[in-house]
Amino acid sequence: MSEQISEQSEQNVYGASSPVPAGESSPSAASAPRTKVRTHHLQKWKAEGHKWAMLTVYDYSTARAFDDAGIPVLLVGDSAANVVYGYDTTVPISIDELIPLVRGVVRGAPHALVVADLPFGSYESGPSAALAAATRFMKEAGAHAVKLEGGERVAEQIACLTAAGIPVMAHIGFTPQSVNTLGGFRVQGRGDAAEQTIADAIAVAEAGAFSVVMEMVPAELATQITGKLTIPTIGIGAGPSCDGQVLVWQDMAGLSSGKAPRFVKRYADVGGELRRAAVQYAQDVAGGVFPAEEHCF
């Protein structure tokens, strides 16, 4: 089926809270149908200067809520290792643990572009391994694109995947899968290291990546890279100049425990609301208040 979209469809691809070109009204579910977001929409938004949001998501119900909210890109991140499976780092999670999550998200998000993370150990050995891993996510889970970490060192893998028709989102700066070699959770690209970060960004773009995540990179450097690249940049702890922004949804919504990273803004207290609801439910059951007559047949 043709990927060409009419001017009207290009306008309708934006969700209620997504970027809309100047002079156009923001369509809502009631006023205009939404179109499936594709990689070329992100390129168009960069060219027009429209910023957009990406969130991680790991299940059908949350994906449906974010899709309804108009979030255009959803990432089934290897951060599921932490927030779904309870691992200390993202290193242990496997393809087999991620694929069922991607399936659920794809079913719950008919409009969003769904990106699947390639986990540690699934692509580092070379293009063949990367192709095998990415193919599984595309065929078995229905992902629309994959993401992998690294700059120049994974350029061959990115080129291989794009040549095979698999869209690739790159990830540079702080790469969580390499936490053991980076010496912990540290800002990347400071001082002399900035040149390597720039080289990594250029390398992934030239290899064919359709976008690049920059994590924990100085804002000034992220601004410089965003200006150099023709592909969209997505920031997480990389300042406001990136074309898009991404957060782990549990951090964004206040479900994560402990102190949030500096780059996180919490927009809700979902964790607190869940605890309050659970306590009230348990009290109602213990007190014989629930179920009441209106809950019975």
Curated annotation (Swiss-Prot):
Residues given in the record as 3-methyl-2-oxobutanoate binding sites: 78-79, 117, 147
Cell compartments where the protein resides: Cytoplasm
Residues that hold Mg(2+) according to the record: 78, 117, 149
Polar residues bias locations: 1-15
Entry EC number(s): 2.1.2.11
GO BP terms: pantothenate biosynthetic process
Organism: Mycobacterium marinum (strain ATCC BAA-535 / M)
Protein name per Swiss-Prot or TrEMBL: 3-methyl-2-oxobutanoate hydroxymethyltransferase
NCBIfam families with a match to the protein in the record: panB (TIGR00222), PRK00311.1 (NF001452)
Disulphide bonds in the chain: none
Low complexity bias spans: 16-33
Keywords for the protein's UniProt record, in alphabetical order: Cytoplasm, Magnesium, Metal-binding, Pantothenate biosynthesis, Transferase
Principal location class: cytoplasm
Family: Belongs to the PanB family.
CDD domains found in the cross-reference section: KPHMT-like
Cofactor(s) required for function per UniProt: Mg(2+)
GO cellular component, one term: cytoplasm
InterPro entries: Pantoate_hydroxy_MeTrfase, Pyrv/PenolPyrv_kinase-like_dom, Pyrv_kinase-like_dom_sf
Region of interest: Disordered: 1-40
Protein's job: Catalyzes the reversible reaction in which hydroxymethyl group from 5,10-methylenetetrahydrofolate is transferred onto alpha-ketoisovalerate to form ketopantoate.
